[in-house]
């Protein structure tokens, strides 16, 4: 079955309050099945969980929002190397559309990534998403790094908790302006901010 979607590529400040409300509901429904904790940041019309994206790719179909991906340019540190990247995050597909191939449509972001002038895009996903991500990487458009820890700031400061968190997610890298073999070596990525 072919899925027809219309992509909207926009800067964050182009979104109106109604857009944030619609995205908030979309994220609660998309992330809620993985646990209430994952849906909580999107209460009250908020359409971001940690860092706010700079650009968004939003796919719409006849029902409403079908898919979403956020993009944020930032410097990360990979091992000893400071690296400008486009972080990809806030990825979601409406639950009724999962396994319909919409993930491959994220290629709609490619021109935007080139416009941003970054050598690589990178994102992190839970290990439970490995099969999904591996299918996407089979065509050589991306590569999965394992055994790499990622340290991020915590978006909400709490006096009783540390201000950073180190995790062991799957790291996915996408070549944009440079080939994959130029990704610097290192077993720790310093995100230098909150997760997107």
Curated annotation (Swiss-Prot):
It comes from Rhizobium meliloti (strain 1021) (Ensifer meliloti). The keyword Cell membrane does not apply. It is found in: Cytoplasm. Belongs to the NodA family. InterPro entries: NodA, Nodulation_prot_NodA_CS. GO terms for cellular component: cytosol. GO terms for molecular function: acyltransferase activity. Keywords: Acyltransferase, Cytoplasm, Nodulation, Plasmid, Transferase. Its EC number is 2.3.1.-. It holds the Pfam family NodA. This is Nodulation protein A. Its main location: cytoplasm. It is an enzyme of class 2 (transferase). N-acyltransferase required for nodulation. Acts in the production of a small, heat-stable compound (nod) that stimulates mitosis in various plant protoplasts. The N-acyl substituent is a C16 unsaturated or an omega-1 hydroxylated fatty acid in R.meliloti. Transmembrane segments: none annotated.
């Amino acid at each position: 079955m072919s899925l027809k979607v219309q992509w909207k590529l926009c800067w964050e400040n182009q979104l109106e309050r109604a857009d944030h409300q619609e995205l908030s509901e979309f994220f609660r429904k998309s992330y809620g099945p993985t646990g209430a904790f994952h849906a909580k940041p999107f209460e009250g019309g908020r359409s971001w969980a940690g860092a706010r994206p700079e650009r968004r790719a939003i796919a719409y179909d006849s029902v409403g929002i079908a898919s979403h991906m956020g993009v944020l340019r930032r410097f990360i540190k990979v091992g000893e190397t400071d690296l400008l990247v486009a972080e990809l995050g806030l990825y979601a597909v409406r639950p009724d559309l999962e396994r319909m191939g919409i993930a491959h449509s994220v290629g709609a972001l490619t021109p935007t990534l080139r416009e941003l002038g970054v050598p690589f895009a990178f994102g992190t996903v839970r290990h439970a998403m490995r099969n999904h991500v591996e299918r996407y990487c089979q065509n050589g458009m991306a590569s999965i790094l394992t055994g790499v820890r990622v340290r991020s700031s915590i978006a909400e400061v709490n006096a009783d908790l540390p201000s950073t968190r180190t995790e062991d997610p799957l790291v996915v890298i996408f070549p944009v302006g440079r080939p994959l073999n130029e990704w610097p070596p290192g077993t720790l990525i310093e995100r230098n901010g909150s997760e997107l």
